[in-house]
């Protein structure tokens, strides 16, 4: 899926950062404390229920995507986050046109002092801190220690300095950026916004509908025990409400989230074995898949907080080598999730290249 935005980011580089007024700042700090207490209590309850019901704390799904238990939802079901694959390219989104020599005269790179530590990444773990492309730029803020390939890949898209020109980041000149893991993200986002954060990227989201559990080698259906379509698609949940609350009180802060990859995670063939949860939340072998279960491969496949109203939700199109010039150039990827939301809003907000993008990895300091 779509990792990073940014013509929007580079546009915000040109803005003067106005401090939050005191009322907004207080509201954000109060929200940060509330979200922290709520998140940690919810996670503690989720761990207890996981032991009771045999829920995995962590596993791998197809394409080696990481999946983590982070809480329980309003219906008492486990809430998992998963990484979304493949970020964007500068040519497709036309970011290269606002760089020096890009033809528009903006000469934007992110190098201005006002942008230092105004950009942040929330992800599964930590970007490789010694990587040649951004070593010394990334400040880890929440004591996360696990170096993760996905996080390193996203960081490269955002601000690789361009030692390898093919992997040059959108804001390649930025002097400093923050990094957080995905636990307690709402609390951390509110606190960071109170301190002047301008842009954050979140290339992960909630597991919904069908998901292949690589560790258990089985297809799992994540809908409620008695439903044929997962309600989480298009649903405005408390996570979406939290995002909107933060954005409302931080008018200069842009939250960027991936739309998701649900349209190719369609479950087993009709008649093949699948698993789902019973009314108590325990996984069981549900036998042969009936043809009545949704394949989540059409419209309304955006999961939960991606449906927030005041964030930028980014979908994925195929890369456009020559750059975008007309609408026919943009061809949707087969995997990227689509709206609308349950209340009829159009999502995602924008689309850009999200397929097989070249960027940094955590294999070594120059990979």
Task: Provide a role label for each language-model segment.
Residues 96, 222-223, 326:
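Flexible, solvent-exposed coil segments and beta strand-coil junctions
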Residues 224, 244, 254:
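Short, acidic/small-residue loops that bind anionic groups at enzyme active sites
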Residues 207-234, 238, 274-290, 367:
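A solvent-exposed, charged loop/short amphipathic helix patch at secondary-structure junctions
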Residues 109-111, 240, 258-309, 315-347, ...:
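Active-site-adjacent substrate-recognition loops and nearby beta-strands
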Residues 20-22, 92-200, 205-217, 248-254, ...:
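Subtilisin-like serine protease catalytic core
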Residues 1-26:
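Bacterial Sec-dependent N-terminal signal peptides
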Residues 27-31, 36-121, 139-147, 184-185, ...:
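N-terminal domain-start motif of subtilase-like serine proteases
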């Amino acid at each position: 899926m779509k990792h990073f935005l940014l013509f929007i980011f580079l546009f915000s580089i040109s803005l003067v950062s106005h401090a939050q007024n005191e009322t907004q700042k207080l509201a954000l700090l109060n929200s940060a404390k509330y979200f922290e207490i709520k998140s940690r209590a919810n996670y503690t309850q989720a761990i207890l229920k996981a032991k009771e019901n045999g829920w995995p704390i962590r596993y791998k799904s197809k394409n080696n995507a990481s999946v983590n238990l982070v809480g329980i939802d309003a219906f008492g079901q486990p809430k998992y986050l998963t990484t979304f694959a493949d970020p964007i390219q500068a040519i497709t989104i036309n970011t290269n046109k606002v760089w020096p020599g890009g033809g528009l005269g903006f000469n934007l790179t992110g190098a201005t002092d006002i942008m230092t530590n105004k950009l942040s990444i929330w992800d599964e773990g930590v970007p490789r801190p010694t990587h040649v492309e951004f070593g010394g730029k990334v400040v880890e803020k929440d004591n996360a220690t696990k170096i993760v390939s996905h996080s390193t890949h996203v960081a490269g898209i955002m601000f690789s300095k361009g030692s390898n020109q093919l992997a040059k980041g959108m804001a390649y000149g930025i002097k400093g950026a923050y990094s957080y893991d995905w636990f307690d993200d709402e609390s951390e986002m509110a606190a960071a916004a109170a301190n002047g954060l301008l842009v954050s990227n979140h290339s992960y989201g909630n597991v919904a509908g069908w998901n292949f559990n690589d560790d258990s080698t089985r297809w799992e259906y994540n809908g409620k025990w008695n439903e044929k379509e997962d309600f989480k698609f298009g649903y405005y949940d408390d996570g979406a409400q939290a995002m909107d609350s933060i954005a409302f009180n931080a008018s200069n802060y842009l939250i960027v989230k991936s739309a998701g990859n649900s349209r190719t995670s369609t479950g087993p063939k009709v008649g093949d074995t699948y698993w789902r949860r019973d009314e108590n939340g325990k996984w069981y072998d549900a036998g042969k898949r009936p043809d009545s279960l949704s394949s989540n491969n059409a419209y309304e496949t955006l999961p939960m907080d991606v449906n927030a109203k005041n964030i930028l939700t980014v979908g994925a199109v195929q890369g456009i080598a020559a750059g975008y010039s007309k609408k026919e150039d943009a061809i949707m990827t087969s995997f990227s999730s689509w709206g609308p939301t349950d209340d009829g809003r159009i999502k995602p907000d924008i689309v850009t290249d999200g397929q097989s993008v070249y960027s940094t990895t955590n294999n070594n300091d120059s990979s």
